[in-house]
Amino acid sequence: SNGLILVTGPTGSGKSTTLASLIDRLNEKESGHIITLEDPIEFVHSHKKCFITQREIGSDSISFSRSLKALLRQDPDIVLVGELRDAETIEAALTIAETGHLVFGTLHTNSCVQTVNRIINAFPSDRHDQVRTLLSFVLQGIVAQQLIPKTFESGRVLGMEILLPTTAIRNLI
């Protein structure tokens, strides 16, 4: 499959763990080439059914956006972008998703609506319509998550909001 799947939440909300679980599941069930761009690499993935290339920003590559521009020459099926930090990185991720790849990414936002708005507002206002259109075509889902303290015992529990785009949601974007 292709498109863009985002896992969002504040620092320490388990975004990296969720993405590592998704990558591991795909690695067990699918075959293909997975490329991860991370800062830093938090989970090391071994090859199962997929060939996995993990790159660390700062040591293996200069930036997320620069890595994304060069990445298509390695013929990935799935791409994980550790963090969509700026318009250049977001645009590269959207373009890769548009060209038939499955792209996972994270943002530090607290809700699905805030995530959509953050992506659009990362660009100058004269590009908002173009970004909205592209996002509405490639978005496959957003998981906004937080770790919430348990009420009657120690520890935390995962709370999440999931947006799966329907035709109506795509039109609203």
Can you say where each PLM-predicted feature lies in the sequence?
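Short, flexible helix-loop junctions that flank or precede catalytic/ligand sites
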Residues: 1-173
